[in-house]
Regions:
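N-terminal glycine-rich phosphate/pyrophosphate-binding loops that anchor nucleotide-derived ligands
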Residues: 1-62
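A glycine-rich phosphate/pyrophosphate-binding beta-strand-loop-alpha-helix module
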Residues: 47, 51-54, 58-108
């Protein structure tokens, strides 16, 4: 699903659980997790949750005086999550990535 957001500058193809990146200088790296009932509640639309997760990562990198170029995506979802919910989350992630010209490098 994220192949359309992949980056051609990777040292290899888009990863599954990791990405091999050749930094051209200093690199700021950040990781966040968002939990239901802590960072959002069930009233928040799924696409907004996906969008917010990317926005949070961009904000963290910006706070370090750097510019985000790519993201790694990891989702811990219930086994019986609906396709509708999954694609809504993905849609929010994709929208945010397009807004900030980010590439999905891999994830879990």
């Amino acid at each position: 699903l994220f192949l359309s957001l992949g980056r051609s500058g990777l040292a290899g193809d888009i990863g599954d659980d990791a990405a091999v990146i050749r930094p051209s200088g200093r690199m700021a790296v950040s990781i966040d997790s968002y939990s239901d009932g802590v960072h959002f509640n069930r009233l928040v639309p799924d696409d907004s949750i996906g969008y917010r997760t990317v926005t949070g990562a961009v904000s963290d990198i910006s706070a370090m005086g750097s510019a985000a170029e790519s993201v790694l995506i990891s989702m811990g979802l219930p086994r019986k999550v609906s396709e509708e919910k999954f694609f809504a989350l993905y849609g929010g992630i994709k929208k945010a990535c397009k807004k900030w010209s980010l590439k999905v490098e891999g994830g879990d």
